[in-house]
Amino acid sequence: PYFSENELVSQLKVSASYGKVGNLTENAVPYTTYRYSGNYNNNIAAYPNGVDNKDLRWEVINPLNIGLDLGFWHDRLTIGVAYFHKKTKDMVFDIPLSTAQAGYTNKDGVIRASKYINIGEMTNSGIEVTIGGKIIKNSDDGFNWSANANLSTLDNKVTKLYEGKDIVGSYTLLREGEAAYTFYLPEWAGVDPATGAPQWYDKEGKVTSDYNKAEKKVLGSALATLYGGFDTRLSYHGISLDAQLSYGFGNKIYDQYGEFGYLDGKTAVYPGYRSQTDYWTPENPNARNPKPVYNRKDKAGAASSRFLYKGDYVRLRTLKLSYEIKPAFLENTYLKKVQLYVMGDNIWTHTFDKNFKYDPDMQVNGYASFALPPLKTYSLGVNVNF
């Protein structure tokens, strides 16, 4: 309802919704056992693509949303608060199997053993807050300043799995009570300052240079727990300045190609990262990287938290300065509006983990995958309305 006579509260709205949604996977691959893109003597050929599961069902999502929107002083200040809870049942996941259970050879001659099944349940819940304000409000030609901010939290939990068992991958696991995309890795303990050997923590929390004794641990999720944005606009006599920022906190990112970026002397094939030059020597005992050893066998580059980084970031997505020519100058022309502008996109990003080299605002699975940041672009232009 809108309170036209109320000078303080101009808007008060309460909303709630609940539903049931079927969620098909992003493509039909989980539902197929053969593909027909193979070639045999220049003819179309079918080849195995998966293990049959006649009981595979759609995921079912039950979303609950409750919101409150408020406006004050004729909407000079607006506040929105919403709670969401989304429960997903019958999650579709590709689980590994032994080749004795269900192995098949794909078109590349690689033996695969996995099967898509409905493995369990997951919840996503959190709070979304939006605040908007017309901080300084004058006539269109006067000085005006407005700003908007939004903040969201996310609590993701896997609540039920097939037979209650962990599903462990090369770098991650699914476990009841943990978030999806949880990293499960040996914990890196740095470099032995006496010998330059790589170190990890064993199951008793002691330092070891034997990778086979290193204990895997839950080391965070690829999902951000806090994210949002901020935008603002200042204008005066046709001149406007617009800025937009975004941010994300609480997630981890894994560089699965770190073994090639930090070769530690293993081979000369790849140039690697520049920071690998900070390696152990008797004169540099507190180096970040182990002593270089050609054709090394100690698994210094094996999967571990050595290549796991914090994904926290703040990015200035857009900065735009514009000038709109006054209508009086456009009289007796066919032009209704002319705006001149200079604009920059993705011109600044602050990554809080100084050792991370790639774009922190990336795909949800949390793998760096040599991902380059969005290009910085600068443009000068004219918008014309007839």
Question: What are the roles of these predicted feature ranges?
Answer:
Residues 1-176, 237, 303, 308-386:
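Extracellular/periplasmic, surface-exposed regions of secreted and cell-surface proteins
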Residues 41-48, 84-119, 148, 155-223, ...:
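Surface-exposed, extracytoplasmic segments of Gram-negative outer-membrane nutrient-acquisition systems
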Residues 235, 246-248, 324:
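Solvent-exposed strand-to-loop "edge" motifs in beta-rich extracellular domains
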